[in-house]
Amino acid sequence: MAEQTGAVDQCLLQASSFKSQGNKCYTEHRMRQAVSLYHKALLQLRSLDASLYSPLPGVGPTAVKLNSQQAEELKTLQADCYNNLAACLLQSQPPRYQRVYECSLQVLSLQPENVKALYRAGVSSYHLKDYTNAHHYLSQAASRAPKDGNIKRYVQLTDTALSTFREEEKQRYQGMFG
């Protein structure tokens, strides 16, 4: 067991190192390298994630046993890497909104109250023209960070777009059944 604990700690340490290098690249506006490093960190963490292993005994690899501290560190590192990956993808040209949305959902599955993930899920939904979803995520973000100007701005943009969309839909249906 001690040998396995050491291997787990080494894996977490390596993933943390990739994440730190990714953070450095992010602050230096080297988004492509940052994305690559966050991916490497997540790949490193995959080997520890029990949810990815087969529930059938004897089929596929067996799950690694983590102590509570390691499990918490795994969860935090995964959430941080997905959140940072979403931030990079949001700043890429052109922004990759579908991937931002997917990464944000990964964070929210691990940390449902994460304001940055709620905001990014809302922003990406807005740009994907899914205004109902955008409103849902941005409202949650606004309730947790009521003074954040970016969140307020996107809530207003979303409300306007949602209102326009509903009005156009109403006009369309009136024309059909008029």
From Swiss-Prot:
Look up keyword Zinc-finger and say if it applies. Answer: no
Q: Where are the TPR repeats?
A: 15-48, 79-114, 115-148
List the residue ranges forming a coiled coil, or say none.
none
The record's section on InterPro entries has: AIP/AIPL1/TTC9 (IPR039663), TPR-like_helical_dom_sf (IPR011990), TPR_rpt (IPR019734)
Does Repeat count among this protein's keywords?
yes
Q: Which UniProt keywords apply?
A: Repeat, TPR repeat
Domain of life according to the entry: Eukaryota
Q: Which family does it belong to?
A: Belongs to the TTC9 family.
Q: Which PANTHER family match?
A: ARYL HYDROCARBON RECEPTOR INTERACTING PROTEIN RELATED, TETRATRICOPEPTIDE REPEAT PROTEIN 9C
The identity of this protein, by name, is Tetratricopeptide repeat protein 9C
| Highest classification ranks of the organism | Eukaryota, Metazoa, Chordata, Craniata, Vertebrata
